[in-house]
Curated annotation (Swiss-Prot):
Pfam families in UniProt: Glyco_hydro_67C, Glyco_hydro_67M, Glyco_hydro_67N
Gene Ontology BP annotations: glucuronoxylan catabolic process
Keywords: Carbohydrate metabolism, Glycosidase, Hydrolase, Polysaccharide degradation, Xylan degradation
Positions that bind substrate: E158, R159, K281, R318, R335, K359, E386, E510, W540
Gene name as annotated: aguA
Assembly behavior: Homodimer.
GO annotations of cellular component type: extracellular region
Site (Participates in a stacking interactions with the sugar rings of 4-O-MeGlcA): residue numbering on this chain: W150, W540
Summary of activators and inhibitors of this protein: The metal cations Ni(2+), K(+) and Zn(2+) show some inhibition of the activity, and Ag(+), Hg(2+) and Cu(2+) shows very significant inhibition even at relatively low ion concentrations.
Protein name, entry field: Xylan alpha-(1->2)-glucuronosidase
């Protein structure tokens, strides 16, 4: 940790199995900034893992063991690889040991492809794989693989649990260029190609990021990310024409407003020629937007898209739009329905450089909620998915909660938008409806902490997000194994133990928190710790409706809010009926008596008791398994993780006792096993 922070999974520890393999040359004829970064990374990895310093050459030595780096623009690679690579970021890795010297070829369709290919090769070395017979063709499934930062310019991070911003402090840029470079390396190593650096809730100072005052600083950050194949985006304030433009309105149909945004876009691209575009949170949670002027979201987004289009820029328009002034007495209004109701009628009305960014579920990154019905419901409108890597509702990086299994369930969910086989992953990779732009974004979990993510094991969520964004068909087991070996080494006990901990942790967290998909039950505002009625009588639309007889939200067509009708018929029917609704989502879709029997055979109330007692024991098991690794993990990381796991056990007990006591007092029904409940 020589730089004051960890290298995470790019540790490049020595690998004795390669001690006899001596690469003498790196053949690299290209000199672009990306290529220079590629060569530097390869040299760093070979130096650390194999203790060799191959020369970088442009002219080939026919007798030398070598690694060849190139693109399809290079004459010698164009013909043999013709038609192999379709995606501009794709690459080939091949070994050649047939005639004489040992060669590795890492060939990309573009420089970015070579970058990803080199990181893949270094991953193989870190994993201790046999590199003698490589024949790999890789192409990303998703075009846009993005990280969203919720960093504020005062240095704080909204929903951040890993220190302060690495970009901003005291309303200025930090100028931590080496750390930003190392962050870019981490992101590029898992295939991330886009980043927005400021919070979607754009405050007064951040509104000025699109002005001459801050654009030189934005350009400096963009230069660093560009070197690693990452485009820079900014979150913008929809009211900017008023707040910094001196106009009396931000009406998207006003000619002066449109002119102002066109001039602003032109200015940005003078500083950053490959600027990615804007991320927009509008008409949501008190943020300004087109509704103020009687316009819809298509009119609002298209105005920005028109300004960016001449430069190839994108508008990423968030669909997190709902009534945050709901009357809790009103049982007909349903926050879960809002995104679909707002956006579905606008299908086909958005410009082609607009992408709708849709949260994985209809509510707000809960430990369990159904997949948003908006996925697949707009065949004429670009869509991408938003997940939350930062653990706002899943333990805030004090608790271990590996989110890859959750995201896998979402990606593999069949929408039935074009019949069976219409999974969410096919919607967001653009293949189902031939979207021009699509992809996936994750809200970052990093900050200035030495381990980047607060909880060392939370690094696995950032790593896993990138790997899933590149290839949604990777399994959670594969991703966990890759991360553990690269981060902690290949000792079999270490790999087996930490992989088990990761893969078990989401269900464990779910067990001791809110039951059966009902969500929330957290302290208002900061969202940490149990408070069953914390939001029950608020204006946020996040209710569980527990009374003396039962619990849950009736979202059926027959007797409830009608939310189930937003799904395609196969899923609508599944969720509408108690007979087919999955247990884990029962209380999201139905209000049932505490004595209702789940498909598991347990009653709802007994399930609540059982899972909360079991969850605490499972949290203890996480800590116990980690303690068995003492001496196999360096002291710093061992104690850091142990401290977090101890916190998790204590907080799991609090969750257990609050939830079980609350529902005992509501229902008056005893735990059939007579365990301790505070009456």
């Amino acid at each position: 940790m020589t730089a004051g922070y960890e290298p995470c999974w790019l540790r490049y520890e020595r690998k004795d199995q390669y001690s006899r393999l001596r690469f003498e040359e790196i053949v690299a004829k290209r000199t672009s900034p990306i290529f220079q970064a590629v060569v530097e990374e390869l040299q760093k990895g070979l130096r650390s893992m194999m203790e060799i310093e191959p020369q970088v050459v442009q002219e080939v030595n026919e007798t030398a063991n070598s690694i060849w780096l190139g693109t399809l623009e290079d004459e010698e690679f164009e013909r043999p690889l013709e038609g192999t690579l379709v995606h501009p970021e794709g690459y080939v890795i091949r070994s050649d040991v047939d005639d004489g010297p040992f060669r590795i070829y890492i060939i990309g369709k573009t420089d970015a492809g070579v970058l990803y290919g080199v990181f893949h090769f270094l991953r193989l070395l870190q994993m201790g794989e046999n590199i003698a017979q490589l024949s790999i063709i890789e192409q990303p499934k998703n075009r846009l693989r993005m990280i969203n930062h919720w960093d504020n310019m005062d240095g704080s991070i909204e929903r951040g649990y890993a220190g302060r911003s690495i970009f901003f402090v005291d309303d200025q840029f930090v100028k931590q260029n080496q750390r930003i470079k190392d962050y870019a390396r981490l992101l590029a190593s898992v295939g991330i190609n886009a980043i927005s650096i400021n919070n979607v809730n754009v405050h007064k100072t951040e509104t000025k990021l699109i002005t001459d005052h801050f654009l030189p600083d934005v350009a400096e950050v963009a230069d660093i990310f560009r070197t690693y194949g990452i485009k820079t985006f900014l979150s913008i304030n929809y009211a900017s024409p008023i707040e910094i433009g001196g106009l009396p309105t931000a009406d998207p149909l006003d000619p002066e407003v449109r002119r102002w945004w066109k001039e602003t876009a032109k200015r940005i691209y003078q500083y950053i020629p490959d600027f990615g575009g804007f991320v927009v949170k509008a008409d949501s949670e008190f943020r300004p937007g087109p509704f103020t002027y009687g316009r819809d979201h298509a009119e609002g987004a298209n105005m920005l898209a028109e300004a960016l289009a001449p430069f190839g820029g994108l508008v990423i328009w968030r669909c997190f739009v709902y009534n945050c002034q709901q009357d809790w007495r009103d049982r007909t209004t349903d926050r879960a329905k809002a995104a679909y109701d707002h956006f579905k009628p606008l299908d086909g009305q958005f410009r082609e450089n607009v992408i709708l960014q849709i949260k994985n579920g209809p509510m707000d990154f809960q430990v369990r909620e159904p997949v948003s019905p908006l996925f697949g419901a707009m065949p004429k409108t670009n869509q991408m998915m938003e997940v939350q890597i930062t653990q706002e509702y899943t333990g805030q990086q004090k608790h271990l909660c590996f989110l890859i299994p959750q995201w896998k369930e979402v990606l593999d969910f069949d929408t039935y938008a074009k019949g069976k086989g219409s999974e969410v992953k096919k919607v967001i990779d653009g293949s189902l409806f031939d979207y021009r732009y699509s992809g996936i974004a994750g809200v970052s979990n990093i900050g200035s902490d030495p381990n980047w993510t607060g909880h060392t094991l939370a690094q696995a969520n950032l790593y896993g997000f990138g790997r899933l964004a590149w290839n949604p068909d990777l399994s959670a087991e594969e991703i966990a194994n890759e991360w553990v070996v690269q981060t902690f080494g290949d000792d079999s006990q270490v790999v087996e133990t930490i992989s088990w901990m990761l893969l078990s942790s989401w269900r464990i967290y779910e067990n001791y928190t809110s039951p059966l998909g009902v969500g929330w039950m957290v302290n208002p505002g900061h969202h940490y710790g149990p408070n069953v009625d914390g939001y029950e009588y608020s204006h946020w639309g996040t209710y569980h409706y527990a009374d003396r007889d039962g619990i849950g939200v009736d979202r059926t067509v027959a007797t409830g809010t009608g939310y189930t009708a937003q799904y395609f018929p196969e899923n609508a029917a599944m969720y509408e009926s108690l007979d087919t609704c999955p247990d884990e989502l029962l209380l999201f879709f139905h209000h049932v008596p505490y004595t209702h029997r789940l498909h598991s055979g347990e009653t709802v109330i007994q399930h609540i008791y059982n899972t909360h007692f079991e969850g605490v024991e499972q949290a203890k098991q996480l800590r116990k398994r980690w303690e068995q690794l003492k001496g196999k993990i360096d002291e710093k990381r061992y104690h850091d993780v142990l401290e977090r796991l101890t916190i998790q056990v204590e907080h799991a007990k609090e969750w257990r006792d609050v939830i079980n006591t609350y529902f005992y007092r509501k229902s008056g029904i005893d735990d059939q096993y007579g365990r301790k409940i505070y009456r």
